[in-house]
């Protein structure tokens, strides 16, 4: 698999291509469980009515809308993604209190420090080569006591879960993704990117090294998804 700028370009182009089928495929590939996982992530933010949240790698806005639902009509949620087509799809489902911007999750120079109650990234961290900068920026933009939440696909450790995972993600997901989206590379990239991603304990260490404390993580659905949560000191 390509690395560096070439990989970033290919991944960006991939998301542009699959944007219109992205949410349908998420539902098919997870049997709808992604909605449950997203709910867990939203709960972990501790976001209150009227709160402000930043959703990085927001894609078509699935988690962004859930955050807005929790923040309520007086809240504000900013969704940032590097794919124009994913943002175009997100904007087709407008929700009061949400703003979408094209941008880089590792370069939030336009976002004021300490301006958000929570920052989230769901299923996007494994697409970002520089995790140190990602989490340093997420920690910077949340207020003291604010939460940084990362929801990500993982490799399960249990034998039964690992066997199912191997069958599903290595064989069925690429076939299903190719048939529905017409993009074979996109859904062969998915299992490969998960295999290459840092282990959950390692991800927790990266968060701790970049301005976050009380970092915890837990797995869901047999460990195929992990939820990491850290708090900005203060």
Regions found by a protein language model. Give the residues of each.
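Conserved alpha-helix/loop element of class I SAM-dependent methyltransferases that forms part
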Residues: 30-52, 66
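C-terminal alpha-helical "lid/dimerization" subdomain adjacent to the S-adenosyl-L-methionine
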Residues: 9, 151, 155-210, 216
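Short glycine-dipeptide loop
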Residues: 49-50, 73-74, 142-147
